[in-house]
């Protein structure tokens, strides 16, 4: 074959008929880019083919221009433009610390970045500088996931400085939606005048009562009283005093020294008092910012069911999502607990006293829904199980109960501001297995068992915090111990319970205005020692027992139709003596 050359064939290897089109295949290897970047990172670690050194502080980082330019518009502009850095072998980056820059260049090569509480505040601005927008978004997402009443205002300020528009809106909405808890924190007290005005003037502010806004203003002024006193009138302009109850205006607002000493503020108070003197139809004709009800965005809620007997005391806590009709297990209690009092106060769920399977306890655990975590706080002064618990005027009241030997008439209150318990006036009757509720600023203790007469009780007492006195109100129509007590639309409901061996399904409701009880529709099932809560105009009764077994079912009452409906989904565990609270669904 000497002198001959190999010529390419003019015929394709695969031939098709004349009537068929030429065929071809394009393939994309999804792993190719990842492998390529992995090799480039290995070359960088060995300082092979590197053509630039990036310097920040005392940290020097070898890299490849083409890789940096491909992933960062900042570096692309630097290396392809007319700046001196386009040809420099060593480039200093200012306004970024060396460790952060190293992490970001690692990200360019590996697509991996760790965002933490410790580094997010330096990582986000550095990612913004290098125009690594995915990292910047990761930082924003992380901060959004960390929003909490104690930090949302700080995150809002950070987002504002760095023009993170979505995060700014999310943090601001969070502050509005959790205002009763936000106002208690150092961040709120450190806000500027304009920032406070902007927050409390929002129609979206979520408060159960305008009292919270008034209290927030007083707290902010008193935090630096000498320098802030002059701003009192400007702040009170945004407090919707006409929407406050008349008793609160007279007993609290009018008696506040900061109001008494300011003529403009006194004018706002007079305006509110005049508003209350008007008939309802005339009130509706008054159009000014202080008479306009706030219209907060409705936050989704979840129901927390804490501990209970199943059949022994348990640590389990379940969470019900109303929107999704789903039960989930959340963080367990630190120790077994049943027959406890459970309430929601200042953004947290409190589990108070109870029985741990062997002893009645004084201890109190607090649940943070954002962190999904329980912590312990100051213990009560007395051991109490089968107590009643309720919140009134920012105090948690522990009412009656059983200490292991006798029923209790004593009542103590807890202030989360001081982390201290103190006794208030005792009830007239010892009551264990007592139900409690708060209506129109009064605390009610309903039924129970007195231990002395060895009978279940039909009597009801009312506590007035202004006078520190308990007085009897109208009796229920029947004796009820272990009744589930809840409040809906300003009325007090007593559900189920028992009288000796007889477990009830009957329900009656108390109207404070007329001091009368009336029967409403029976529940679907007999229940005693059930948890009760009100959500979205419905009254939920959770678990309990029917005298023979613990119940996993939940039913709710609609006062419009006077009907009870069973939830389609049961708890995973039948439990009696569980506590129930409703919280905003954590983000």
UniProtKB/Swiss-Prot annotation:
Pathway: Protein modification; protein ubiquitination. SMART domains: BACK, BTB, Kelch. It holds the Pfam family Kelch_1. Kelch repeats lie at residues 302-347, 348-394, 396-441, 442-490, 491-537, 539-585. One of its GO terms (molecular function) is ubiquitin-like ligase-substrate adaptor activity. The modification Phosphothreonine is found at residues 295, 375. It is found in: Cytoplasm, Cytoskeleton; Cytoplasm, Cytosol. Residues 1-22 are annotated as: Disordered. Residues 50-117 form the BTB domain. Keywords: Actin-binding, Cytoplasm, Cytoskeleton, Kelch repeat, Phosphoprotein, Repeat, Ubl conjugation pathway. Phosphorylation at Ser-433 by PKA or PKC decreases the interaction with WNK1 and WNK4, leading to inhibit their degradation by the BCR(KLHL3) complex. Phosphorylated at Ser-433 by PKC in response to angiotensin II signaling, decreasing ability to promote degradation of WNK1 and WNK4, leading to activation of Na-Cl cotransporter SLC12A3/NCC. Phosphorylation at Ser-433 is increased by insulin. Dephosphorylated at Ser-433 by calcineurin PPP3CA, promoting degradation of WNK1 and WNK4. The modification Phosphoserine is found at residues 10, 376, 433. Residues 152-254 form the BACK domain. It comes from the Eukaryota. One of its GO terms (biological process) is monoatomic ion homeostasis. GO terms for cellular component: Cul3-RING ubiquitin ligase complex; cytoplasm; cytoskeleton; cytosol. CDD domains: BACK_KLHL3, BTB_POZ_KLHL3. Substrate-specific adapter of a BCR (BTB-CUL3-RBX1) E3 ubiquitin ligase complex that acts as a regulator of ion transport in the distal nephron. The BCR(KLHL3) complex acts by mediating ubiquitination and degradation of WNK1 and WNK4, two activators of Na-Cl cotransporter SLC12A3/NCC in distal convoluted tubule cells of kidney, thereby regulating NaCl reabsorption. The BCR(KLHL3) complex also mediates ubiquitination and degradation of WNK3. Homodimer. Component of the BCR(KLHL3) E3 ubiquitin ligase complex, at least composed of CUL3 and KLHL3 and RBX1. Interacts with CLDN8. Belongs to the KLHL3 family. This is Kelch-like protein 3.
């Amino acid at each position: 074959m000497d002198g001959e050359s190999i010529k390419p064939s003019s015929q394709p290897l695969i031939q098709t008929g004349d009537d068929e089109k030429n065929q071809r295949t394009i393939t994309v290897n999804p792993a190719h880019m990842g492998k390529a970047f992995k090799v480039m990172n290995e070359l960088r670690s060995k300082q092979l083919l590197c053509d630039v050194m990036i310097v920040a502080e005392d940290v020097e980082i070898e890299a490849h221009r083409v890789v940096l330019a491909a992933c960062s518009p900042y570096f692309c502009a630097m290396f392809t433009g007319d700046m001196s850095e386009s040809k420099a072998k060593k480039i200093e980056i200012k306004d970024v610390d060396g460790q952060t820059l190293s992490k970001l260049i690692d990200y360019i090569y590996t697509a991996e970045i760790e965002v933490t509480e410790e580094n997010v505040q330096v990582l986000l601005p550095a990612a913004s500088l290098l125009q690594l927008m995915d990292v910047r978004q990761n930082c924003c997402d992380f901060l959004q996931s960390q929003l909490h009443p104690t930090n949302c205002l700080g995150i809002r300020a950070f987002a504002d400085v760095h023009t993170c528009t979505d995060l700014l809106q999310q943090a601001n909405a969070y502050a509005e939606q959790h205002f009763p808890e936000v106002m208690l924190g150092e961040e709120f007290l450190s806000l500027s005048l304009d920032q406070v005005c902007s927050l409390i003037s929002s129609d979206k502010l979520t408060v159960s009562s305008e009292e919270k806004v008034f209290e927030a203003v007083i707290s902010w002024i008193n935090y630096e009283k000498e320098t802030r006193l002059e701003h009192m009138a400007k702040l009170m302009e945004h407090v919707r005093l006409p929407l406050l109850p008349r008793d609160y205006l007279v007993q609290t607002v009018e008696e506040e020294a900061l109001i008494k000493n300011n003529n403009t503020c006194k004018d706002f108070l007079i305006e509110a008092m005049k508003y209350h003197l008007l008939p309802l139809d005339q009130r509706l004709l008054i159009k000014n910012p202080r008479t306009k009800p706030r219209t907060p965005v409705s936050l989704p809620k979840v129901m927390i069911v804490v501990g209970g007997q199943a059949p022994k005391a348990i640590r389990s806590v379940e969470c019900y999502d109303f929107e999704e009709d789903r039960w989930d297990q959340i963080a367990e209690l630190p120790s077994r607990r049943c027959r406890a009092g459970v309430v929601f106060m200042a953004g947290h769920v409190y589990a108070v006293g109870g029985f741990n399977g062997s002893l009645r306890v004084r201890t109190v655990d607090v649940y943070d829904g954002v962190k999904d975590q329980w912590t312990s706080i100051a213990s009560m002064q007395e051991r109490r199980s089968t107590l009643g618990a309720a919140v009134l005027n920012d105090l948690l009241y522990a009412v009656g109960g059983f200490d292991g030997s006798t029923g209790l008439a004593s009542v103590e209150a807890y202030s989360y501001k001081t982390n201290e318990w103190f006794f208030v006036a005792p009830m007239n009757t010892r009551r264990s297995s007592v139900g409690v509720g708060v209506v129109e600023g009064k605390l009610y203790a309903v039924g129970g068992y007195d231990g002395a007469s060895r009978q279940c009780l039909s009597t009801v007492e009312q506590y007035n915090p202004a006078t520190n006195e308990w007085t009897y109100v109208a009796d229920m129509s029947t004796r009820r111990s272990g009744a589930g007590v809840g409040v809906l639309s300003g009325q007090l409901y007593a559900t189920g319970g028992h009288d000796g061996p007889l477990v009830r399904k009957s329900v009656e409701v108390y109207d404070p205005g007329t001091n009368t009880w009336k029967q409403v529709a029976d529940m679907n099932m007999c229940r005693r020692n059930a948890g009760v809560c009100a959500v979205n105009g419905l009254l939920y009764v959770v678990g309990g027992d029917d005298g023979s077994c613990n119940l996993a079912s939940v039913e709710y009452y609609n006062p419009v139709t006077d009907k009870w409906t069973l939830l389609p989904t049961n708890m995973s565990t039948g439990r009696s003596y569980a506590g129930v609270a409703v919280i905003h669904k954590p983000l």
